[in-house]
Amino acid sequence: MLSGHVTFVGFGLLASSMAAAIRASKLPLTIRIVSSQKTRERAKELGFADESFGYEEVESWARGTDLILLCSPILHILEMLESLQKIQVESQVVVSDIGSTKAEICKAGARLSSPFLFIGGHPMAGSEKRTLEYNDPSLFENAYWFLCPPKGTAPEEYSLLSELIAFLGSRVVLFEPEEHDATIAWLSHMPQMVSTALAGNLPEDLLNNNYQHFAGRGFRDMTRIAASGWNMWRDILLTNRSAVLNALAGFAKGVKAVENALDKLPTDGDEALHKIFESGNKGRASLFAPGRVAGHGFYEVSVALEDRPGTI
């Protein structure tokens, strides 16, 4: 059974959801949180915090713990890693993070002195909601959780982290930091920018007439993540700029192919558009094929509900 002391540095949606799951299962884990005074007070009201500290109290929160999870925005994670470089601890402390980019974070983590052990991490979970008020103990169920351990690190050295991830219902995937960043640029970061650009570039005439209210499900689905906050995404784009640019260039190439095919209609271009749609169909279907981890795939479930108050 999981036991020990876990310290969450930053206590937004993801950290509070982990704490909620731990509390709901009554695991013998001591939860320590590091955050602003307002958030610490709210976490105590919700029963999530056994101990709490301010960010500046690094001498206190870095000691007396088995696992430190850095759960703040990426640039703040880098600041916290720099602060930890100045701390000496007597026994091993595993340090991980939930940042959406890994190369720069893992380089900073590698500068920690033993017995700190840094394992870069990134759970593919979350939403456009950002605070502990939206905590969800089931948030991590069936999610992939990327880990980037230093080469030669035995899994036993970070077993508490792996056990916590398994308890939360996620599946560990080991990745090299650079490979992670290139992959997630395509699967997460570039789609965010496309969604943001789509929602932010509606024609002025359309907006002046309030025609955006006629948007169908497709537009609403494609722009849901346009509600995401700039502060978090600023850090992601600053630390994964090159990979995101490469992904955007690849996407732009696809859009250009659509433009070229449309431009040739009606005399030509029909076959080209047919192939573009076939390629899109195959790409979408590939999401639901068995995955590279234990043969798991995704499933799409549609639930028809009557549109009236109280249905959900």
Regions found by a protein language model. Give the residues of each.
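Internal alpha-helical scaffold of NAD(P)-dependent oxidoreductase catalytic cores
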Residues: 139-225
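Rossmann-like NAD(P)-binding element
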Residues: 58-89, 94-96
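NAD(P)+-binding Rossmann beta1-loop-alpha1 motif at the extreme N-terminus of oxidoreductases
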Residues: 1-60, 67
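A conserved regulatory-domain signal marking ACT and ACT-like small-molecule sensing domains
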Residues: 283-312
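Rossmann-like NAD(P)(H) cofactor-binding subdomain of soluble oxidoreductases
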Residues: 80-133
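Interdomain hinge/lid region at the active-site interface
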Residues: 208-279
